[in-house]
């Protein structure tokens, strides 16, 4: 009985994590859905544990509303670098990815990580795969 009462006290996000199959959720299906640039609502919350956030271009919001289009969804992908250090090859790959899939910026943070912005849903998988290939990670 104690476990049930504690379970009820969990936040909505904790309930989503609890039923997510080790943070998998339905992210795979969300990424395959060609009808929208967004992820399913529960997956939007889960991807932060994979080092990414769903965003949209606010500058285009009113123009897209007038045309009855959904917001221009895009993603921020965070790359962890132990001690904030990368090899020259890792740096070159991150720079290439920012040009190829992002909005041509690579942000350095005060938390020893890098951020790509403007990644479209269809480019999330190849971006993260390439990050992993050079032995870096997006996991939070």
Residue positions per predicted region:
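Feature of Fe-S/electron-transfer and energy-metabolism proteins
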Residues: 1-140
């Amino acid at each position: 009985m104690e476990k049930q009462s504690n379970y009820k006290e969990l936040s909505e996000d904790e309930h989503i994590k609890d039923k997510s199959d080790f943070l998998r959720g339905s992210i795979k299906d969300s990424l395959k859905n060609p009808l929208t640039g967004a992820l399913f609502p529960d997956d939007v919350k889960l991807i932060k544990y994979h080092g990414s956030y769903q965003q949209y271009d606010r500058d285009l919001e009113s123009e897209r509303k007038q045309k009855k289009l959904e917001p221009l969804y895009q993603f921020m992908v965070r790359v962890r670098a132990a001690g904030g250090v990368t090899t020259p090859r890792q740096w070159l790959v991150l720079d290439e990815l920012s040009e190829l899939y992002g909005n041509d910026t690579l942000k350095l943070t005060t938390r020893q990580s890098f951020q790509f912005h403007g990644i479209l849903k269809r480019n999330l998988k190849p971006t993260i795969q390439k990050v992993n290939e050079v032995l870096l990670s997006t996991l939070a």
